[in-house]
C-alpha cells in the first residue's frame, strides 16, 4: 500500500470533526457502513475494509465464528462451566456469536491491512486501538467516543407500526412476573399437576392454538412453559389457554426462598471459579485465534462481562426448569429449536431424567452445504433431541444427504399451516396490490456486514419501488419482524409517497390482498409457503446469495434487468402466471406433506410416545 503520512482507520464512533484536520495528508479506511456514508457525504476519498478480504475468506471467517462461539465445548474447560448437567457457556452462545461477527471481521481486516503498512502515523478509534495491540501495534486514539458494546439480550425491543419501546432485560422480567400474577386467577388449570402430560417449551400460545386444541381432543394434558415471553399477554392468548385447559406454571408456582438463596450462593461460587478459569490465557489464546494471531487479550474482558451478566439468571432458569420437570414428570418435552437457553436447559435436564425430547421443525430451513452448517450451528435441526419432526420429504432428503440419523426423523407436516390449507384459495386475480417481503441484513452472517451487500439491498429496494410506480401498482412493503430498519420508509417516501411500509401487520391479510408476492432477503421466509398455498406467484430478486439456497423451486429468481418485464408478464399473461403457480405447488407438495391434517398426524405420533414411550 502506498500510503500518505497518516492512515486513519475509521468506524462509527469517529465523527467528521475528529478527522477534518487530517484530510489533506491522510489515507482513510472505513470499517462499517456508517463511516463509509459519512466520508462519502463529505466527498472524502477512502477505501473500504471489506476490500481487503477475498471472497473465500468470508467463508473462513464464518467458520471461525462458529468455532469461537462454541468455545465452551473445549474439553479443557467444559467441566468447569457445568451446573446441574448444563454447560453455562452454551446458554449465551448465540448472543456471543452476534457480538463476535463484526469484531472478528474487523480484527481479520486489521491483520490484512497491517501486513502492508509502511506509514508512521496510524490513527484509529478506541476499539481498533485495542485490537491493534493484539498485533503489537500502538495506534493513536483519534476519538474519545466509547463504542457501544451492548449484548443482544441486554434489552428487549417492542415494535409497532407507530412506536418502538425498549426495556432492559431486568425490567422486562419484572413486567413478565407481574403479568403472570395478574392472569394467574383466570387460569384455574394452572393449579393442577397432571400425571400424564407433554411439556411445551417457549411456544407462542396464539400460533399454537390448533396444536393445543388437538391435544385437548386426544385427552393429552399440556403444560406451556414460557420464560422468554409470557404464555398469556392479551385476551386472545388467555382465551386459548382457558379453552384448551392448558396448564401455565407461573414464576410464583416454582420459586421459593430456598431456591433464591441457593441461586445467590451458587452464582457467587461459580463466578469465583470462572474468574480463575479465565486466567488460563494459554488455553483461551489458542481457542480465540485466527490467521495465527490470537485476540484473547481484547476479548477477555468482554466475554467475562457477558458471562457475569448472564450467570445468576442462568442458574435461576436451571433451578426453575429442574423444578418444573421434576414436579410434573412429563411424558415428553416439545421444543422448536435447541439453541434457546430455556430449550437447552430443558434438553440437558430431560436427558438426565430420561424424559424424551422432540424437536419440531420451525421455519424454512436452508438446504445447501453452507446452509446446513448454519442450521447445525443455530441448532434449528436435531443435535441432541431424541426425535425430529420435519415438514416434508424435502427435509427428509436433506437430512439423508447430510448423514443425519434417519431413524429419529419423521416427516409429519406443519401444524402452523393447516388452517391455510383449509381456506379456499383464490383462483382469479382480484387484487392489484404488490406485496414486498423484505429481510435486509439481520447481522447473523459476516457477509451481512459487507458494505457492498448493504448498498445492493438498498439499490434493489429502489429498483422495486420504481418498478411498482411505473406499473401504477400499489406496493405494500412488509419488513421482517426481527430486522433492523435500513431506512426503507425514507427510501419509499422519496420515490412514491403511496408506498406503505409496515413491520407489524397481519401477514395473511396482506398476502390475500396482493396479486404478486416479491421477496428480497438473505433467506426464504415461511411467508413464501403461505403465498404458494394461497395461489400467489412468488418472485425474488437476487440478494444474499452466499448459501446458494435459492434454486429449490420455492420462487422464481429474476435478475434486476429482467424484473420489470417478468413482473408485467406475470400480471398480464394468465397462462404464464398459472405455470409459475403450478411449478411452485410442486415444490410445496414436496416441502409440506399432510396438508391440512398435519396437526392430527403430529399429535397422533406424540400420543404413542405418551402411552408407550420412545
Where do the protein language model's features map onto the residues?
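Catalytic-core helical/loop segments in enzymes performing group transfer/polymerization on anionic/lipid-linked
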Residues: 1-614
Amino acid at each position: 500500500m502506498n500510503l500518505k503520512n497518516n492512515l486513519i482507520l475509521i468506524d462509527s464512533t469517529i465523527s467528521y470533526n475528529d478527522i477534518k484536520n487530517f484530510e489533506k495528508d491522510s489515507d482513510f479506511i472505513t470499517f462499517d457502513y456508517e463511516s463509509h456514508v459519512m466520508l462519502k457525504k463529505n466527498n472524502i476519498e477512502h477505501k473500504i475494509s471489506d476490500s481487503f478480504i477475498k471472497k473465500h475468506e468470508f467463508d473462513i471467517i464464518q467458520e471461525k465464528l462458529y468455532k469461537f462461539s462454541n468455545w465452551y465445548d473445549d474439553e479443557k474447560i467444559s467441566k468447569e462451566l457445568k451446573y446441574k448437567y448444563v454447560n453455562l457457556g452454551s446458554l449465551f452462545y448465540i448472543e456471543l456469536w452476534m457480538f463476535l461477527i463484526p469484531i472478528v471481521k474487523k480484527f481479520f481486516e486489521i491483520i490484512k491491512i497491517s501486513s502492508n503498512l509502511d506509514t508512521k502515523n496510524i490513527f484509529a478509534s478506541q476499539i481498533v486501538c485495542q485490537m491493534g495491540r493484539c498485533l503489537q501495534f500502538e495506534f493513536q486514539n483519534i476519538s474519545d467516543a466509547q463504542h457501544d458494546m451492548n449484548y443482544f439480550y441486554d434489552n428487549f425491543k417492542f415494535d409497532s407500526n407507530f412506536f418502538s419501546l425498549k426495556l432492559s432485560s431486568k425490567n422486562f422480567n419484572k413486567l413478565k412476573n407481574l403479568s403472570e400474577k395478574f392472569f394467574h386467577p383466570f387460569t384455574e388449570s394452572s393449579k393442577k399437576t397432571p400425571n400424564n402430560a407433554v411439556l411445551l417449551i417457549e411456544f407462542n400460545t396464539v400460533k399454537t392454538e390448533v396444536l393445543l386444541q388437538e391435544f385437548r381432543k386426544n385427552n393429552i394434558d399440556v403444560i406451556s412453559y414460557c420464560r422468554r415471553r409470557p404464555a398469556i399477554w392479551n385476551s386472545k392468548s388467555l382465551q386459548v389457554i382457558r379453552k384448551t385447559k392448558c396448564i401455565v406454571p407461573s414464576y410464583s408456582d416454582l420459586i421459593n426462598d430456598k431456591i433464591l438463596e441457593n441461586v445467590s450462593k451458587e452464582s457467587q461460587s461459580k463466578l469465583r471459579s470462572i474468574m480463575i478459569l479465565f486466567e488460563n490465557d494459554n488455553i483461551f489464546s489458542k481457542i480465540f485465534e485466527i490467521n495465527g494471531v490470537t485476540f484473547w487479550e481484547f476479548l477477555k474482558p468482554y466475554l467475562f462481562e457477558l458471562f457475569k451478566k448472564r450467570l445468576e439468571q442462568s442458574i435461576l432458569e436451571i433451578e426453575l426448569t429442574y423444578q418444573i420437570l421434576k414436579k410434573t414428570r412429563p411424558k415428553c418435552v416439545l421444543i422448536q429449536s435447541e439453541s434457546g437457553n430455556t430449550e437447552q436447559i430443558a434438553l440437558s435436564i430431560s436427558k438426565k431424567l430420561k424424559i424424551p425430547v422432540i424437536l419440531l421443525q420451525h421455519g424454512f430451513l436452508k438446504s445447501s452445504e453452507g446452509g446446513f452448517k448454519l442450521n447445525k450451528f443455530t441448532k434449528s435441526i436435531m443435535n441432541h433431541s431424541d426425535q425430529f419432526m420435519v415438514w416434508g420429504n424435502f427435509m427428509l432428503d436433506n437430512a439423508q444427504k447430510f448423514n443425519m440419523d434417519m431413524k429419529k426423523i419423521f416427516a409429519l407436516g406443519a401444524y402452523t399451516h393447516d388452517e391455510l390449507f383449509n381456506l379456499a384459495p383464490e383462483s382469479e386475480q382480484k387484487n392489484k396490490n404488490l406485496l414486498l417481503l423484505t429481510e435486509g441484513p439481520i447481522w447473523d452472517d459476516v457477509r451481512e456486514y459487507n458494505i457492498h451487500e448493504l448498498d445492493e439491498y438498498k439499490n434493489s429496494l429502489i429498483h422495486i419501488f420504481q418498478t411498482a410506480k411505473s406499473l401504477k401498482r400499489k406496493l405494500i412493503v412488509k419488513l421482517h419482524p426481527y430486522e433492523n430498519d435500513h431506512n426503507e420508509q425514507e427510501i419509499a417516501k422519496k420515490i412514491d409517497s403511496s408506498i406503505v411500509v409496515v413491520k407489524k401487520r397481519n401477514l395473511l391479510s396482506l398476502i390475500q390482498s396482493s396479486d404478486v408476492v416479491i421477496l428480497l432477503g438473505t433467506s426464504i421466509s415461511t411467508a413464501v409457503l403461505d403465498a404458494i398455498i394461497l395461489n400467489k406467484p412468488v418472485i425474488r430478486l437476487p440478494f444474499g446469495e452466499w448459501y446458494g439456497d435459492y434454486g429449490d423451486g420455492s420462487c422464481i429468481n429474476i435478475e434486476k434487468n429482467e424484473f420489470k418485464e417478468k413482473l408485467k408478464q406475470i400480471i398480464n399473461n394468465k397462462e404464464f402466471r398459472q405455470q409459475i403457480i403450478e411449478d411452485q405447488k410442486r415444490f410445496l407438495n414436496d416441502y409440506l406433506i399432510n396438508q391440512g391434517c398435519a396437526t392430527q398426524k403430529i399429535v397422533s405420533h406424540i400420543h404413542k410416545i405418551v402411552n408407550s414411550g420412545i
